[in-house]
Structure formats: C-alpha cells, structure tokens
Amino acid sequence: MSILIDKSTRLIVQGITGRDGLFHAKKMKEYGTHVVGGTSPGKGGTDVDGIPVFNTMYDAVEQTKANTSIIFVPARFAADAIMEAADAGIRLIVCIAEGIPTLDVIKAHQFVEQKGAMLIGPNCPGLISPGKSMVGILPGQVFLEGNVGVISRSGTLTYEIVYHLTANGMGQSTAIGIGGDPVVGLSLIHISEPTRLRRI
C-alpha cells in the first residue's frame, strides 16, 4: 500500500518555467503523475507542455484543487515558496533545492507544521509510489510496484537499494528520500508506519 502519494495526487510544480522545473515536470507527467499546474510569477495565463502556469500558489490551488507541490526554485527563494504552498492549502510539499540557510528551513518547517501540512526535504530527490505517482527527480524506470517501503536520507543510496530490490523481484510500495540536510521536514520516525507497509 502506497503512502503520501497515489493516483489521487494533484501536483503543482513551483518554478515550472525554469530549466529544472520544466524538465522534471515533463518527466513526472510522463510517469503518470497528475501535474495539474505550475507557478512562475509574472507568467500566469501561459502554459508549458500543456500544463497551465499561475502567478501564485493561491491561484493555482483555487483553479486546480491541487493537494501536493514540488519546489524547483533557487535556494534563496525556497523557504518562501514552502510557506506560500502551505498557506495556500497544500498538504504535502516536496522541496528539492539544496543550500537553503538552516534558519530559513527551521522557520519554514515550523510554519508548515502550524498549517497542518507535511514537508519532505529540502535537498531531497522526492518520493515515488511505483505505478501510481512520482513527485521528484527519481529515475522511475528502476522501480517496481510491490509492498516494500524504502526510506533514506541519500538519493543515490535509495536508487542503489531499489535497483537491487527490483532485480530480485521485490517491488516497492513507496520510496522516499527525506533529504540530507541537518534540518528536514519529515523524518524516518514520522514516515515509518509498519501497519501500512509490510517491509521497510
């Protein structure tokens, strides 16, 4: 059973008109994720690869009923992007950016908790529920649908573990890279729910 994301996930890509945001928005869409919109200040009303672009997260959530966001903005803007997403009503926020000042992450994390949302990252590869949805920069082709949960602070270690699991016919329900920075949103303890995953 997948956790956090599935076929009902409706995703907004913050920073969708940037190089990384656009590249990975296309990859997530190709995987089957419902990428319902993106944000880029000043570019609202346009679209990229058939994905509508909004000026703010408030507009994006109101128009698309999104419940998840992924952040591809420069580190100096990332904390504000996290808080904007939470304030707009997003329930799950994934921050890929690295190099965000620790105090900014602490402030953003506290704000997210106050809003009742969840933060994965920063400095993380995101998460995937194989065959259902991917929110991040993971190589979807190495994953196999199954019942093993994978949780790691390291993106490359996650891929290595999953490669060997898949090669041995052990599919994954959800794989999550929680991020390698000193301060991250969800921790191993938060995510480890043995009642929902047969193996972790």
Q: Where do the model's predicted regions map?
A:
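General beta-strand structural signal in soluble alpha/beta enzymes
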Residues: 13, 37-40, 93-95, 118-123, ...
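Generic hydrophobic/aromatic pocket-lining and core-packing "Φ" positions
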Residues: 25, 57, 82-86, 162, ...
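NAD(P)-binding Rossmann-fold cofactor-contacting core
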Residues: 30-48, 179
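Glycine-rich, highly charged phosphate/nucleotide-binding loops
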Residues: 48-63, 70-79, 187-188
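Rossmann-fold NAD(P) dinucleotide-binding segment
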Residues: 63, 76-97
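Rossmann-fold NAD(P)-binding glycine/threonine-rich loop
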Residues: 99-117
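Short glycine-cluster motifs
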Residues: 146-188
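Residue-level detector of conserved catalytic or cofactor/ligand-binding positions
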Residues: 187-200
